[in-house]
């Protein structure tokens, strides 16, 4: 399986090169899965399981697909404005656009896997993606000053420490009870 994943990552790296992007893979703790659009570099952390690396890389490529479309600056205008002026406060629109882009990036990653004939276990791919999307939803709901992003990364080492239920309840006291109980409280346990 690992050899198949390595071959898949090589296919994606070739696809990125055709798009004018380089792939930088590293085990350094400072490297996170992300795209630097100014330098045209996709960063891939090698600290997670190979299957998760593949899924993360497909997701980051989804961002490349989305952001290189001609209509990106129109469709995601608030996000573009926020990136150009980081001191500007986030708006509801920029938060929603960020979440929308994250969801679309997972879908575009899946489409790229199909295009490149890369095997992806759909259930695992979307479960992994849902976990990260929930992190952005939580971030948007509670604000950056209360967010613990490392909590979502530590799951792979069986440390499931996240924001406590009490902290989240206090911060989201206006959240609908059903939404909180079924989605926010247990994002890793639900395939929603």
Pin down the residues of each PLM region.
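Pan-zinc metallopeptidase signature
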Residues: 80-84, 88-89, 112-192
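Basic/hydrophobic alpha-helical interface regions
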Residues: 2-21
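Alpha-helix boundary/N-cap detector
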Residues: 3-7, 100, 124, 163
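Short pre-active-site segment immediately N-terminal to the catalytic Zn-binding motif
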Residues: 41-56
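Post-HEXXH active-site segment of zinc metalloproteases
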Residues: 67-103, 126
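Active-site recognition of the HExxH zinc-binding catalytic motif
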Residues: 55-69
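Intrinsically disordered, low-complexity, basic-enriched segments
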Residues: 26, 30-35
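An active-site-proximal "capping" alpha-helix that borders the catalytic cofactor pocket
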Residues: 98-115
């Amino acid at each position: 399986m690992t050899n198949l994943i390595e071959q898949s990552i090589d296919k994606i790296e070739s696809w990125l090169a055709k798009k004018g992007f380089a792939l930088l893979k590293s085990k350094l703790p400072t490297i996170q899965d992300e795209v630097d659009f100014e330098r045209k570099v996709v960063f891939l952390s090698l600290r997670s399981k190979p299957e998760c690396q593949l899924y993360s890389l497909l997701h980051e490529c989804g961002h490349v697909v989305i952001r290189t479309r001609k209509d990106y600056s129109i469709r995601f205008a608030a996000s573009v404005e926020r990136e150009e002026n980081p001191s500007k406060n986030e708006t509801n629109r920029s938060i929603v656009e960020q979440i929308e882009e994250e969801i679309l990036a997972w879908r575009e990653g899946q489409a790229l896997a199909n295009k490149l004939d890369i095997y992806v276990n759909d259930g695992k791919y979307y479960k992994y993606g849902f976990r990260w999307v929930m992190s952005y939803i939580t971030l948007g709901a509670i604000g950056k000053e209360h967010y613990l992003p490392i909590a979502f990364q530590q799951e792979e080492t069986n440390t499931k420490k996240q924001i406590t239920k009490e902290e989240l309840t206090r911060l989201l006291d206006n959240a609908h009870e059903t939404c909180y109980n079924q989605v926010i409280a247990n994002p890793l346990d639900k395939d929603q």
